Amino acid sequence: MKVAIALTDQSFQRTKSMGIFNVSMGLAKGLMNCPEVTELHILGNNECGDAFKDCPPHVHVHLTDKPVPRRFARVWWDQFGLCAAVRKIKPDWVILPKGVPPFFPRFGKAKMACYVHDVMWEHYEQRSAADRKGPFPWHELLYFRNLSLRAMKISDLVLTHTQFNASRILHYVPQARIARIGIGYDDTPPAPETDSPKRDVLTYASTFPHKCTPLTLQRISAWLNTREDGKDIRIHVVGSMPEELALPNAGWIHHARIPYAELRTLLREKCRMAVYFSDYESYGMPPVECLLNGVPCVASDIPPIRENIPAQYLFNNADEADFIAKANAAYDKKSPFICPEFPTWQEVCNRCVQAMLQH
């Protein structure tokens, strides 16, 4: 089977979703080792192309001399450039890991598989206008809403991860052909620590309103105030801070976007617990990454997170006492550490290939 996968719009520095970036890269790397894929064409750029050096002979990387498309160039690539590139390759299947298909041009005879990560536009349409402000201009939200619905309707195969997200796709397009292939991880959890000297806590920040950064700072501050050792606990905040917010004091350490290898080191060497607040997720990768690095992560109790994270780590966003109780239990190791089993990227890509072969 001859497969093309489009990564030209992927950038670690510029992406608004690290989850989508990680899934895109994981799929491309995993497909290399699927025996059914006899020829793999990766449409890359001069940033993500660096991750695909020294590939096997059946893997071909294209367009690595081009920059990541942005704004109008991104729209032009989505609608015309991608189609032209795919028609030259003439694959059996083209995979769009960002889930953004063109409106009109076709890929020749190639079948199309779109990875639909979320229905986030649905969530933002339901928020009040005052609460909707964020990195989504109205025209961008409308553009991706329409392309997301088109992906659900015209894809020969819709790839996704959680049962929650699959149910939202079927709500809008009951006839969608869905393969729930999941998300892969290649980390092996370290041995459980019974008496860890680590004291730090890791949490996340974002300019996206649904990531609840103000609530995150408020709840963690309240938790610290209840503990005798609260002044000795450092809080690592990973991600982009909203402009109107400042960290409470010098005990809070801000990290901008960091590579996963650096995050992994931070978790394994310094952190005793992680905290993840969110109003909306389609999956929720950060809590899983924390567990796979041996760090309990207390997280918002919403349906997609509930599919992957043990109940002992879940709290009600609206209940401060519940958060404090769950945080204390995790930090003080009152219950045995639990890390469910998660598929590797190779297993996820095998599922993807089998689904394509069946269609």
Model-derived features: where do they sit?
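Carbohydrate transferase catalytic cores enriched for Leloir-type hexosyltransferases
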Residues: 1-359
